[in-house]
A protein has these predicted regions:
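Helix-turn-helix
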Residues: 12, 16-54, 58
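Amphipathic alpha-helical segments used for helix-helix packing
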Residues: 84, 96-119, 167
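Hydrophobic alpha-helical connector segments
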Residues: 58, 72-98, 150-154
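Hydrophobic/aromatic residues within well-ordered alpha-helical segments
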Residues: 52, 59, 63-67, 81, ...
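C-terminal peripheral helix-coil segments that are non-catalytic and often amphipathic
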Residues: 94, 129-141, 152-153, 157, ...
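Amphipathic alpha-helical packing segments from all-alpha helical-bundle domains
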Residues: 65-69, 87, 115-142, 148-152, ...
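N-terminal intrinsically disordered/low-complexity leader segments
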Residues: 1-7, 192-196
Length: 196
């Protein structure tokens, strides 16, 4: 017998998971715990989601895509390319990792503990990097392969700031750091530009 999925049940699972991921972190949250929090059986959770990482990405993907759209609109409002790059790095390294009580830290926990059995898809990360590379290319007028490399470095730093957001003595990204790295990125782009 095929079980019919109900949107209200799915939403209850996602709400319960969000609460637990926010309070306990990804590593300390379990499917049975999510089921208890949502007031249902563990088996019922598996009717709606394949795994804990699936639940996490059902929460994280729309949030991240919304933030990237918002960031794109903010980028369009800044005329100066160097200032646009500084604001991009500040958003990536300070603002996004801190939002929702450092919720992005859960993604770092999930990816670092993924078993490699196909439960993690890099599609969202690839989209994220592609959009960041496009913005960097607009700011620095670099070839796409170099913009992609710079975006990769920017996202590795994003990962680090997302992991550190919950540590008591970790230095956060601030305006001075974003300004310094925007100049470093610009210098790297300028040094690789062909000379006339």
């Amino acid at each position: 017998m095929v079980q019919r999925k109900k949107e209200g049940v799915r939403d209850a699972i996602l709400e319960a998971a969000f609460r637990l991921f926010s309070e306990q972190g990804y590593s300390e949250t379990s499917i049975p715990g999510i089921a208890r929090e949502a007031g249902m059986s563990t088996a019922n959770v598996y009717v709606y989601f394949q795994s804990k990482i699936d639940i996490l990405f059902q929460l994280y993907s729309p949030w991240l895509l919304g933030r990237l759209d918002k960031l794109e609109r903010a980028q369009r409002r800044v005329a100066d390319p160097q200032e646009r790059l500084r604001k991009l790095l500040l958003t990536l390294w300070r603002d996004l990792p801190r939002e929702n009580n450092g919720f992005t830290n859960n993604v770092m926990q999930a990816v670092s503990t993924s078993s490699g059995n196909g439960d993690y898809s890099p599609a969202l990360r690839q989209l994220f990097q592609s959009r960041v590379a496009g913005w960097i290319q607009e700011c620095l007028a670099t070839p796409s392969d170099e913009s992609d490399m710079l975006a990769s470095v920017a996202l590795m730093a994003f990962d680090g700031f997302a992991m550190n957001v919950r540590l008591a003595h970790s230095p956060p990204c601030d305006d001075d750091m974003a300004r310094l790295f925007s100049r470093l990125f610009a210098g790297a782009a300028a040094s690789s530009a062909p000379t006339p």
